[in-house]
Structure formats: structure tokens, C-alpha cells
Amino acid sequence: MSVDQTRLQMAVGVTASPAPERLHALDAVRGFALLLGIVLHATLSFIPAPTRIWIIQDNHPSMTLAVLFFVIHVFRMTTFFLIAGFFAHLSFHRRGGRVFIKDRLQRIALPLVVGWPIVFAAMVPVVFWAANFPNGGRVPGAPGWPPVLPRFPLTHLWFLYVLLEFYAATLVLRTGMAWLDKSGDIRAQVDRLIGLTMRSPLAPAILAVPIGIAFNLDPTWFGWLGVRTPDQSLVTNLQAVVGFGTAFGFGWLLHRQIDLIRVLERRWLLNLVLAIGLIAASFVLASVPWPRPDAVRFAGATCYALAIWTTTFAVIGVALRFLSGFSATQRYIADASYWLYLIHLPIVMALQVAVSSLDWPWPAKFATILLVAVPVMFGSYQLLVRYSVIGAVLNGHRIRKPSEAAELIRTQS
């Protein structure tokens, strides 16, 4: 490495990594988080509840799927935003600010602006269809449209809107920091603080403090809510800003010292064991009636906040430990996951309505929803997206290789 290259890395705060293949694991985690979102939304019609919480309530509810929802909801989006912040810092310093902004507008803003009307329009007939079922609720009245701003039904695409907010905030903060900290002393202190935090066994507890406080400031919070989803307003709620913003910012700063991710790899088993215990405790605190609700709410909020970060670290650590090498199949799934997540909700909702009144056991219904939806969506990605303009917008230009299909078959055999 030349002296100029070394100086450049020091200037941007990025240390050389002897194992760049680790980024394959992080890319896999990002795709995994999006695919888990499909599973999570597929569980919603089966969750036992005294009142309908989703477009349709299946006639065969399942506590097992309710537990699956709870577990996924604990860590999925915090993990996603941490990885998003990590890769945002990588992209910013690899491409420069101007290209980074152009790239984010193409890959995040354009899918939101173009995709939202299409997805929302596809959801409307499903809502009308569901209204014909006794357990499908009623069609929203005309006075509810258009929504009165800032209320706005962002649907599951809220994560794109929040990402754009975080990109903008980060660029403003970075510009201000570069102006205030010309010597780099403040950034060096921040790097040291991040390093001390990551190396400490209390790292999940330290990072859990902001979202734990946000939970406790909300008198209506309870464990099944988790971080309140900011899907119904253009003003992102406090819990989402604090919880997901902490994750995004930490991911951005973590990439400045990329070797720190090895700590997560070394502690994967410890974090996994702790995560299982904390999720179990959070579930009990959220589900069992207790004589002192205020005290239990505080305990539940604290436990849930710890579970968020311990599970996030566990999932990333497991991926770093077992998925660091390149895999064509793994890369294909990671690339496809973005498209699948963008389009999945109307498809999943329609299938939920279709099976809701059938006299099938819930495992058969749940499996049917996923086994129909997922292959259809993967097929649409391969045939309509991967080598098309849509694929270029979402994942960058891709040249079809004659050997690609053969390689996929080889890796799966």
C-alpha cells in the first residue's frame, strides 16, 4: 500500500481489512432482513387477537406464528438499518458525495416515488375483496382519501422514506463536522469511543439506552409493539428516529473501523444465547397479565431494548462466522431480496384473504402463502428485473453471463 493510500484511509477513518469477503456476510444479512419481512407480514393474519389487527383474520389462528412474529419484529429493522449505515459509509467514501447522492436518489428515492402508487393501487382491490369476508373488516370510507398531511399511508415502503431521511441527516451532520473539526480530533475521539463500546461486553446494553428511554417515554407502549412502525405519517415517530437512527449512525461509524466487526464474529455464540433469553423474557413480560403494570412496562421496555441490540449483534455475528465466503446462490438471493420486498405485500395479502376461510390447519395455510408467493416473486425477478432497466435501478447494471445459470445449479447441487 502506498503512502498516499494510507493517508487517504486515515483521512476518511477507514482501516484496511485483511478479509474483505466479510462484506458478503453483511450483504447476506441485509437480504435476510428483507426476506424475513415477507415472513413477518405472512404471519399477521394468523395472530390471535381480541380485535382484528390486519386486513384479514384467519379462522385458524396460531400462537406459534404469533411467537414467530414477535421474534422477527424484535431485531429485523434495527439489523437492517445498521447494515444500511455501514454500507452507506462504504459507498460515500468509495464514490464521493455527489455520486453517492445520485446513487441513493436512483436506488431509494426512485423506487419509493414510482413504486408506492403501483403497490398501493394493487392493495386497494385486496382490501375490497377482504371486506366481503366476515373477518375481513370494512372498506375505508371515501372521506379518508386523500389523507390530510402529514398523515400518509407509506405502507411497507416506509423504510425507503426513513432511509432518505437518514441519508440527508447524515450528510448534513458530516458537512458540519468537517467544518468544525478540521483537525480531525473530534472524529478521532468518536472513533475511540466506538472502539471502546464495541470491545466492551456491555456494548448491547450501551446501545440499548436510547431506544429504552424512548420506550419508557411512551405511556401506551407495550411489548408487542416493539419500535413503532412509521408507516402512517410523513413525520417519523420518535421511537423510529431514535431506534433506527441509532442503528444507522452506529453502522456508519462502525465502517470507519471495519475490523471492529470481528468482535461480533468472536461473540456470536454468547450473543445468541443471551438473545434467546432476552427475547423469551420480553415475550413473557408482554404477554402475561401482571399485578403492577407500570413496573412491568418499565421492565419490559428495558428487556426489549436489550433484546433488540443483543439479537442484532447475534445475527450479524452468526453471518460473519458462517457466511463470509462468496456464494453465487447467496449473492443471487441478496440481490433479489430488494425486489421481492418491494412487491410482496399485495401478493401476500391476496393469498391471506384467499385461504382465510378454508378449513385447513394453519401450517398448511401459512406454507401455501409462502410457497406460492415466493417462487412467483423470484420468477418475476429473474424474468423481468435482473437484466432489465428495473434491475439496473435497484442493483446496478448487470451483464448476463452464459455460465451464470450453470454456476447456480452447481452451487445448489
Where would I find each of the regions flagged by the language model?
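Alpha-helical transmembrane segments and their immediate juxtamembrane cytosolic regions
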Residues: 2-413
